Amino acid sequence: MDLYLLASGRKFGVVKSDCISNNGVNVKDVGNALNEGVVGAIDATRKMVVSLGTVMPEIQKCGVTFEESSEDVSDFYLVRWDSIDDPLNPKNWPMWKKWIVVVQISLIAFVVTFGSSVYSSGIGNVSMDFGVSISVSSLGSCVFLVGFGFGSLPFAPLSGIYGRFVVYFCTLLMFTLFQIGGGCAQNIWTLVILRFFQGFFGSTPLSNCGGTLSDLFTPIQRTYVLPGFCTFPFLGPIFGPIIGDFICQSYLGWCWVFWINMIMGAVVIVIIFFFMPETHGDTILDYKARYLRNKTRNMKWHTIHERQRNPRSAIYQACTDSVSLLITEPIVVCFTLYLTVVYIIGYIDFEGYPIVFAKYSFDQGEIGLSFIGIGIGIVLAGACTPIIYVHYNRVYTRRNGVMSPEDRLYPLFFGSIMLPISMFWFAWTCYPYHPYVHWIVPLISSIFFGWSLLFVFFVSYNYIIDSYQKLAASALAAATLVRYAASGGMSLVGRPMYVNLGDHWATSLLGFISVGMIPIPFLFFIYGKKIRGLSKHAYKL
């Protein structure tokens, strides 16, 4: 007999009935018992649930993740994992199925981050059409990033209550609908407001990716999965101006940057509706309990998670945890600062590159192509993942399955040094009126900028996740809020900075700031264990 997990009329997956019961007892047996009498039904259901309860110690030994509880193990109606090999548990899924989920959240991340930068291609056109200054039309980029930051706070805890799929699907749907509003906007302030909500609902892939990957992969597996995922949210902003500049210089006009983003979002919505399974373990158990209640007509079947659902409390707790970690935890403070600096540099570049390469007589489409170097660097950094994984695996094996969070920091040694080098390289080789310095020279530096960009991001994320574990979602939400809110504000100063300071010193200023970030990975590599030992919240090895 096949068991279909249903929620709101959608089929989430199918497993055989022996995933529900052991000892030869299944739902059909329960149904037959109901026909024979109440006593028989209770007997059958007890036998079925005892089979669930007896495997819990083994689940604990094997490291299968579930919520701890003070619930009495004699609670026969408490739904748990059936065994350590329960195919409903996402950690037991085949690797191909896990990667299908990773690809889908990567596509969502690409679509929403594409939307963060594609608008910058149309800022000049928006300014002319609505009769406002460049600074006012640039608010569309600013408020998107601010909305992106604030959206990270509620959606991470909501995904822990209602499941990952519901949050991904609903927020992407809202993001796509607000693209339609952007394409139809008749004045600048309508457009600015719509851009904020585009960012707000587009924040979920970056705020929830840590939870989704933790649902599916062990920490050592996450070593190669997270960099693979991270290439997409960084390639999105790179392709934004590349495609957007060609759209805006064509007969289509700036409105089509929103229509293109809407089409991309609609395609991904269809894909995830049909192919994305639920990965949150507690939510899957909720579906299992719901099925048993419907099938046996016994309302006593329940999960711990169902009893603890309180959206308001969860959001409040997540917000307070995020603020607390951001104020009191040196690891969160320093790596949030590092990520913020890197993002500020990246989004200022979206304003600065058009100014620099316009002096080389590039047209709008060619200016967009100047971002390809950053994209190449991001892809090359992702290609280094097998080397990094081999290193981590050796450490993991040598230490009998124990890894320190500080072991994650090695790639950042390279990234932290290469970041300022790439900035100074770009700053002092962009001579558009010098016959002996070709435009390709500063563009080559952007490859190393993209490389360091990805290293900083995925190493920081892995280090925070390993350091805070259960509170990692709150720590990452705090980092997301700060870096996007700060990037949004600083994106307004990018164009004036390049105009007033000039190409060389504007980029050099960013380089000097990145020099100040170099000590962070080295200091935490040396003192990280001691800092975690003094923390109330960090994981202590």
Swiss-Prot record:
Q: How does it sit in the membrane?
A: Multi-pass membrane protein
**Main localization (coarse):** membrane
Q: In which compartments does the protein localize? A: Membrane
Alphabetized, the UniProt keywords read:
Membrane, Transmembrane, Transmembrane helix, Transport
InterPro entries from the xrefs? MFS (IPR011701), MFS_dom (IPR020846), MFS_trans_sf (IPR036259)
UniProt KW Protease keyword: no
Q: Which residues form a coiled coil?
A: none
* GO BP, sorted A to Z: transmembrane transport
One GO term in the molecular function aspect is: transmembrane transporter activity
Q: Which Gene3D superfamilies match?
A: MFS general substrate transporter like domains
Instruction: Give me the segments passing through the membrane.
Output: 99-119, 131-153, 165-185, 187-207, 224-244, 256-276, 325-345, 367-387, 409-429, 439-459, 472-494, 508-528
Gene Ontology terms: cellular component? plasma membrane
Family according to the record: Belongs to the major facilitator superfamily. CAR1 family.
Name under which the protein is recorded: Uncharacterized transporter C530.02
In its UniProt entry, the species of origin is given as Schizosaccharomyces pombe (strain 972 / ATCC 24843) (Fission yeast)
